[in-house]
A protein has these predicted regions:
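Glycine/proline-rich active-site loop of Rossmann-fold NAD(P)-dependent oxidoreductases
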Residues: 184-188, 200-214, 247-257
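N-terminal Rossmann NAD(P)H-binding glycine-rich loop of SDR-like oxidoreductase domains
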Residues: 3-34
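Conserved C-terminal active-site "lid" loop/helix of NAD(P)H-dependent oxidoreductases
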Residues: 296-328
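Active-site Tyr-X1-5-Lys
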Residues: 160-190
Length: 354
């Protein structure tokens, strides 16, 4: 499905140094769009240099703006003159001290602040929000109780909280707030992208996203004794970026969109890597659930026995037909995604050969 991108209309991408944001910006500037990108510190060359390089080597341009998710009004300058806003900025961290402070407040207040700036603008036509599949479900065992045992866009996560799966809770409350704000006005439309676990290389060449942790643990020996038996949806980052852009420029796009290629396990990912990267300590077997239940909380405090019981050994399925039919997404092979991701992490020295 071909889409027409209006090069004369500017676009804003929040969280410009993020994993998904980098690819959205790259695709937009290569199409000739002038992009505003918000970052924490525009003067930090180590973190924003790749964005400036995109601006130099593409028909479009990137202009950086400083913004803080928690600071009201900090997005106003970046929004000015933009027709499309891609709100990707939200904390995705697996280790934190205070879930309310570190995850929930930035996700919720950041969404409120960017949409307040959007509503104050006269130029914005559409907002594309980066939500997540975890705004649809809380734990994998819930798949057994939904129609056809398959997650769909009509389902909402009702089981996560600040104390159980707080990241999932942060994405849920942020998306609900976005819909509440969008439905209370008529100046701009909202389209939501709900990706599963995002894999693939980064635009910056630096593996900084929590999405890279699974790859890191397979390559650094953490999973050498075996991989945990959990299944989750996975998708290439370039497909997620493509979905955002299509959601912006396809006029009749609406609602939520599950963007997930297929369900997979760490062990299946390891098998994809073993032929090409056999010199690394990749897991060769899957651990039994009882063993993960026993030692998991000792190894990782966020891996509670409740999380293990409700997510390990359960089937995970999601219906991605809307993303294919309404957005025209053609998914890349996960084999390509994980190999390119792993190779990039080797190139930057993330782990050593065994």
């Amino acid at each position: 499905m071909d889409i027409k991108i209006n090069k004369k209309k500017k676009a804003l991408v929040t969280g410009g140094t993020g994993f998904v944001a980098g690819w959205i910006i790259k695709q937009l500037v290569e199409a000739g769009v002038n992009v505003h990108a918000t970052v924490r510190d525009p003067s930090d060359g180590a973190k924003v240099g790749h964005l400036l390089e995109l601006s130099q080597n593409s028909p479009g341009s990137v202009t950086l703006f400083q913004a803080d998710l928690l600071k009201a009004g900090s997005f106003n300058a970046a929004v000015e003159g933009c027709s499309f806003v891609f709100h990707t900025a939200s904390p995705f961290i697996l280790k934190f001290n205070d879930p309310q402070r570190d995850l929930i407040d930035p996700a919720l207040k950041g969404t409120q602040n960017i949409l307040e700036a959007v509503s104050s603008s006269d130029s914005v036509e559409r907002v594309v929000l980066t939500s997540s599949c975890v705004a649809i479900y809380g734990d994998a065992d819930e798949c057994a109780f939904v129609p056809n045992n398959m997650l769909n866009e009509s389902i909402w996560n009702t089981t996560s909280s600040a104390f159980h799966q707080p990241y999932s809770y942060s994405k849920t409350v942020a998306e609900k707030e976005a819909w509440k704000i969008a439905e209370a006005q008529e100046k701009w439309s909202l389209v939501v992208i709900n990706p599963s676990l995002v894999l693939g290389p980064t635009v910056s060449g630096k593996s900084t996203s929590a999405s890279h942790d699974i790859c890191l643990q397979m390559g650094d020996g953490t999973m050498k004794a075996g991989a945990p038996p959990f299944e989750i949806g996975m998708v290439d980052v370039r497909d997620v970026a493509d979905a955002h852009i299509r959601a912006a420029y396809i006029l009749d796009a609406s609602g939520r969109h599950i963007v997930s290629n297929e369900s997979c396990t760490p062990m299946k990912l390891s098998k994809m890597l073993q032929e090409q990267f056999e010199q690394y300590p990749l897991p060769k077997k899957e651990l039994p659930k009882w063993l993960v239940w026993l030692v998991g909380p000792i190894m990782d405090k966020s891996m509670t026995r409740k999380v293990i019981a409700k997510n390990m050994g359960h089937s995970w399925k999601a219906d991605n037909s809307k993303s294919k039919e309404k957005l025209g997404i053609e998914y890349r092979s996960l084999n390509t995604s994980i190999i390119e991701m792993f190779q990039q992490m080797i190139d930057e020295g993330s782990f050593k050969k065994s």
